[in-house]
């Protein structure tokens, strides 16, 4: 290997931390084209995770490293959200962390790359596209309900508790329960009213907004009194969320029969 090529290799390996994934897009941008990549693979310096993604040979990489690669190298808006983000924030202490499943979401139409879907991460990536918020909310901004956590040698963007709970409510009643949603809200003592207000005003789902306010009023944390409900569009008409349930007349949604509301 020539001196220049050896220098490029040394530079790459020195600046490639353990546990990190590099995409072919990133490598090409840094001046490592297909020929370099193939030679590094042949000489056992790097290994392909799948088409378009690489790790250092013999290195162990996690699902979080894959997500970090998407966010930082591939302009993806995929992030940890919903119930998993709630658990990360410690807002669901009574729940046992499900290490076998991670909720990953995007607010724009995109798909996980094949290498991320096919690789065995030892967890199930429960990926969904949710158009829950207006598209003018820039991804990753703390002011739009995101935060950054460090886990498994990776630094990843996840939903802050306010946003995560709204994402979670979108799963009711199909894959989340009323009782669990109420118990999680009981732990949401320290939500930021300004953030809640901002996200509710920019949420596109009437169901989610009504459910959030239903639970928030029911638990009645101090931050709830600081919300300006007049600025939140709740639409008109009833929404049957739980069949054969009872009606919460204020928010026009049906809830389970054991709740103290009028039967529908």
Residue ranges, per PLM feature:
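Bulky hydrophobic/aromatic packing residues
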Residues: 16, 26, 36, 43-45, ...
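Short gly/ser-rich loop at a beta-strand->alpha-helix junction or flexible surface loop bordering the NTP-binding
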Residues: 24, 38-43, 48-137, 253
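N-proximal short alpha-helices
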Residues: 10, 58-59, 134-138, 154, ...
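Short beta-edge/loop segments at beta->alpha junctions of small alpha/beta modules
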Residues: 1-83, 189-206, 263
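Hydrophobic alpha-helical interaction segments
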Residues: 139-264
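Sequence-level motif detector for i,i+2 pairs with an aromatic at +2
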Residues: 19, 99-100, 248
């Amino acid at each position: 290997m020539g001196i220049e090529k050896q220098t490029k290799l040394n530079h790459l390996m020195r600046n490639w931390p353990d546990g990190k994934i590099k995409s072919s897009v990133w490598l090409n941008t840094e001046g490592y084209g297909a020929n370099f990549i193939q030679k590094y693979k042949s000489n056992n310096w790097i290994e392909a995770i799948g088409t378009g993604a690489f790790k250092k040979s013999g290195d162990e990489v996690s699902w979080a490293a894959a997500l970090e690669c998407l966010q930082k190298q591939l302009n993806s808006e995929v992030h940890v959200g919903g119930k998993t983000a709630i658990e990360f924030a410690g807002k669901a202490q009574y729940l046992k962390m499900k290490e076998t499943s991670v909720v990953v979401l995007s607010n724009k139409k995109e798909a996980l790359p094949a290498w991320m879907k096919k690789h065995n991460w030892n967890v199930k990536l429960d990926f969904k596209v949710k158009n829950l918020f207006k598209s003018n909310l820039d991804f990753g901004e703390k002011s739009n309900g995101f935060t950054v956590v460090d886990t498994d040698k990776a630094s990843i963007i996840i939903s802050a508790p306010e946003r995560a709970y709204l994402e979670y409510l979108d799963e009711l009643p199909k894959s989340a329960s009323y009782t669990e949603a109420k118990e999680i809200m009981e732990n949401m003592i320290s939500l930021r009213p300004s953030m809640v207000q901002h996200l509710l005003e920019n949420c596109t789902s009437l169901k989610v907004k009504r459910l959030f306010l239903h639970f928030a009023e029911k638990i009645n944390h101090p931050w709830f009194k600081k919300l300006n409900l007049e600025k939140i569009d709740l639409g008109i008409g009833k929404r049957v969320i739980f069949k054969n349930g009872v009606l919460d007349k204020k928010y026009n949604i049906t809830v389970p029969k054991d709740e103290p509301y009028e039967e529908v």
